[in-house]
Amino acid sequence: MVDKLTHLKQLEAESIHIIREVAAEFDNPVMLYSIGKDSAVMLHLARKAFFPGKLPFPVMHVDTRWKFQEMYKFRDKMVEELGLDLITHINPDGVAQNINPFTHGSAKHTDIMKTEGLKQALDKHGFDAAFGGARRDEEKSRAKERVYSFRDSKHRWDPKNQRPELWNVYNGKVNKGESIRVFPLSNWTELDIWQYIYLEGIPIVPLYFAAEREVIEKNGTLIMIDDERILEHLSDEDKARIVKKKVRFRTLGCYPLTGAVESEAESLTDIIQEMLLTRTSERQGRVIDHDGAGSMEDKKRQGYF
């Protein structure tokens, strides 16, 4: 009797197949590691794909300098425990200009520290393929993106100039100067991610679990007081509005641009139960997604992941 693969095992097999295909087809791939839950799952799948050997490519974190402190601690812990070959890149031009989300706004901060920083790192190391943990259920521009997302010599995405992927056959031929972004988790949902984390025992950043945290409401978004830098940009009136609430994060990014949600979910089973009932997008708390209609697609056309 042949055992049928479960839904999650089918997704796992598909993702591992994609990761192995890229490793075989491309000369110099890299796996982006943003420290979030999707990156954790993607890294776990990559380690499975090449077990018992080591990853045949490095992992890279494009650092904006504004991630949550717990994310940095978690990143360093994973690098040490797993023996990862980690590349960290910070846009030196952004550092020189002291680009930050308060003074320069979310759009400029994201463009310089994330998009331009990523493009710099890819060019510097000559990577021809970059894995990312984006999923189609996250956002409408990602919903129409291929697993192999082709980029031109300036890393720009043209949604009208992509290749068909019939029967899970991926064409990895690129012209000189071109590269691809690869999304092994394209067909996963947020619920799939959490169920897989639970079943596989994958470690994640504690910020995903509900706890009492200091927050301030800004334009309807609960922003966590993660370090003293945010206090420099708050008025005395704003500081008086800082309160403690039981919150967690469904998605993680730069902390001044990432909203928390009120929640009682303190465990993986609690989170899964919450996911079964929720009807809102996990990216509702991402300030950068509200920069304007079609803002994510515009960012991707310029080279954003």
From Swiss-Prot:
Catalytic activity: sulfate + ATP + H(+) = adenosine 5'-phosphosulfate + diphosphate
One biological process term in Gene Ontology: hydrogen sulfide biosynthetic process
E.C. number(s) listed in UniProt: 2.7.7.4
Top-rank EC class of the record's enzyme: transferase
Signal peptide coordinates: none
Organism superkingdom: Bacteria
Pathway field: Sulfur metabolism; hydrogen sulfide biosynthesis; sulfite from sulfate: step 1/3
InterPro entries: PAPS_reduct_dom, Rossmann-like_a/b/a_fold, SO4_adenylTrfase_ssu, Sulfate_adenylyltrnsfr_sub2
Family designation: Belongs to the PAPS reductase family. CysD subfamily.
The protein, known as: Sulfate adenylyltransferase subunit 2
Taxonomic source organism: Pseudomonas fluorescens (strain Pf0-1)
Lineage: Bacteria, Pseudomonadati, Pseudomonadota, Gammaproteobacteria, Pseudomonadales
